Every structure is written in C-alpha cells, then in structure tokens.
Amino acid sequence: MDNIDNKYNPQLCKIFLAISDLIFFNLALWFSLGCVYFIFDQVQRFIPQDQLDTRVITHFILSVVCVGWFWIRLRHYTYRKPFWYELKEIFRTIVIFAIFDLALIAFTKWQFSRYVWVFCWTFALILVPFFRALTKHLLNKLGIWKKKTIILGSGQNARGAYSALQSEEMMGFDVIAFFDTDASDAEINMLPVIKDTEIIWDLNRTGDVHYILAYEYTELEKTHFWLRELSKHHCRSVTVVPSFRGLPLYNTDMSFIFSHEVMLLRIQNNLAKRSSRFLKRTFDIVCSIMILIIASPLMIYLWYKVTRDGGPAIYGHQRVGRHGKLFPCYKFRSMVMNSQEVLKELLANDPIARAEWEKDFKLKNDPRITAVGRFIRKTSLDELPQLFNVLKGDMSLVGPRPIVSDELERYCDDVDYYLMAKPGMTGLWQVSGRNDVDYDTRVYFDSWYVKNWTLWNDIAILFKTAKVVLRRDGAY
C-alpha cells in the first residue's frame, strides 16, 4: 500500500474550533442587542450606557471560560464525538452558563432585561453548535480534520464499526483500509484488506494513522495482542470497539475495580422509571398540541381531498400498544374502499407480490393506494391523525413502529422490549431507511430504541424525521 497523504493537523483544528466558538458565543450578545434595537428602536432602556461595556467584557470572560471548558473538560477539540452526543453537551454547557449569567446579574444588581437575556442565550444555543459543525465541515473539506484510519478486523463488528463511522462525517475518521491476516476477502466495502503486518508499521512510520480494533468477541486474544504491539510501536491513537451488540449503551455507567481487570457496566432501563415515563408523556402532550395547532389547516384540507371519493377521511386499524393492548391507530385513508378484496385477489394471483407481503407486510407497488393516498404516504402526511393517538395516550411521538398482532412472532426474543414502550409516530427505523430496510433490521432498531431511551434521543429522532420527510427517503 502506497504512502498516505495525511493533511491532518490537530493543532490547527483546536485553534479553528476554539476561535469559532469564541466568536459566535460573543456575537450572540451583539445579535441580541440588535434584535432589541430592531424591535424597540433603542437599547439604553434595557441596558444603560454605563453598564454596556461591563456587560460586554463579562460576556467575553464567560465565553473564554466556556471555550476552556469545551477544550479541557469536555475535550471537544481533540476527542471525536458523534454529532448528537456532542450537541447535547454543547446545549447543556450553554444552559449552565446562561443560568450563571442570570445569577451574576442578580448579585451585581445590574439592570436586568429578560429580552436581552433570552435573545442572547437563544442565539448562543443556535450559533455555537451550527458554526462548530460548519467549521468541522470546512476542515474536513480541506483534509485538516480528517484522520486516516485503519480498522483492525474483518468480521461483523469491523463492518458495523465502518458503517457507523461513515454515518458520522463530523467525526472525521477517514477509513482507508481494513486489516486482518486471516481475512478471506481482498476488499470490504470497496476498501482494501491488508494482510501483511509490515504494511501497518510502514504506514505508522509515514503518517499519523488512527487504529480501530474491532475484532469479534471470540477474537479477544487478537485485541490484546494488537493493543500491546501498537503500544510498543508508540501508536498514540487507538480506539477499541467492543463486540457489545444488543447491550444497552446509552444508559450505561462504567467503573473499574482497582488492581483487578474487572470492568463493571451498570445498565439502566430508563423507560422502567416512573419519572422517565412522566417526562416522555409530558413531552408528547406539549409537542403534539403544538403540532396540531400548526398543522390543523393542512389536516382540514387533506380531510376534504380524501373524502372526495365518498369514503371516510380517517380510519383506525388495530395495532399493538404497550403491554400488548390493542388500539385503533388513526391515519388518513390512502386506499380504495374495497382494499381487502383487492389485496386478497392480488396475493392469490401474483406470487411475487405474495412473497413480498409475507416478507415485509408491505407492497412497493400497492394497487390499493389512491392518487391522493400515494402523495400523502410519500410525504408521511397520512400519519398526522396519529397526533390524536398521542394525546389519548395510545402512542408516543417517538417509539417503536406500530405493528399488527401477526407481526409479534417476527420479533422473537425482542418482543418483550417492543411491548415495554408505546408505538411511535416516528422512530429509529423511519430515520434509518424506512421501507428500504429489511424486517430483521426494523426489529433491531425497535429493541435498540427501547433499551437506549433518553429524551435527547427522542429530540434527535424528531429532527432527523423532518429531514427524512422532506427528502422522502425510503417512503412508498
């Protein structure tokens, strides 16, 4: 393998990312003052002239401390974290600084303006993460943030690690090859599989290469061997991907027993906590009411369009809810009135359609769907009436995919996880390919969601849903 051209420069990355955060943290205050001036045509009424310089200097000091916290404590400029995980840490930090700013104003008896304070910290919550991501994107384009990476392993764990890294561009891991002396494939995902150990050491000498150990759980000795060898060759950058597929990860605390090679994983089931369920329910009610208010004109229009063929606008099909309780899952009708007869006739006469139905319980070219129905399905507008299911408590905004009773047997050992949560209007499978993923993958997504539930995950999935719906990914 030829020498690699590595433009990665960690010092420049730290400087650019820190400067970006510093600039836009401070611009948030000036933008807030601009908004106040634009709305009220004056600023002195909210911040007296003799306090303005002090407030600007204080905000600058807060920005320096915040950037220092990002740099030293959270390691945002050196340690590569997934986008949504890093965004959560940014939001949490800025909210803490906003509260500290409020306390500072109270103790110093400065004139307090709720408009300036709300505008300032709202802008900070938007500008800092947005331009952090933009800066990383530009650094990626220049190759400065990209880190040449080799994955050691060629099994399912290694392939899964590669797919995960490809989905997180902002992490900047540029995988150039796999390595496994026992691999049978010459290529994986169009990347070469290195089988000669000397090539690894040659690459290590010629560039700053990151190594990811992603062997299977049956290959633990290989992981130990390569950790030792990479350490002997002074490799500073090594990541281990344990084969923990199926275990809850988001709600897991890790600790060690001193002087023993024992790692303790404390696994929590958040959805089993009454406080978590109350928080999720409150979030569902508030958000669904807001969406209903905004979407009500559109829903009235769709009701009119759907009923033009003489049938009802909304129908409720029985779906499996929490603890196995059946409920009518509301949707705008997207099929002809005699849909069951059409389906029976199709499955009786078309073996290809029958095989597709038995595999996924869906048809890509479904003759039962009306012209209006095809549009509302493609845009997911047919699911808007499920907001009433959310208000009733049958469903959640985010959760596992609503299924019929016959599908429960397809969940096998994961059926207990499915029955622990309310079905959702959207979920992991909707933002991860929707109808383009196979049924086993849908089951995996549903069980993963339940095992790893956090409110932040729900928020992230809702934002991803908006993107998927606008792009119409995997919808039919």
UniProtKB/Swiss-Prot annotation:
The keyword Transmembrane helix applies. One of its GO terms (molecular function) is undecaprenyl-phosphate galactose phosphotransferase activity. Residues 304-476 are cytoplasmic. Keywords: Cell inner membrane, Cell membrane, Lipopolysaccharide biosynthesis, Membrane, Transferase, Transmembrane, Transmembrane helix. GO terms for biological process: O antigen biosynthetic process. Its main location: membrane. Is responsible for transferring galactose-1-phosphate to the lipid precursor undecaprenol phosphate in the first steps of O-polysaccharide biosynthesis. This is Undecaprenyl-phosphate galactose phosphotransferase. It comes from Salmonella typhimurium (strain LT2 / SGSC1412 / ATCC 700720).
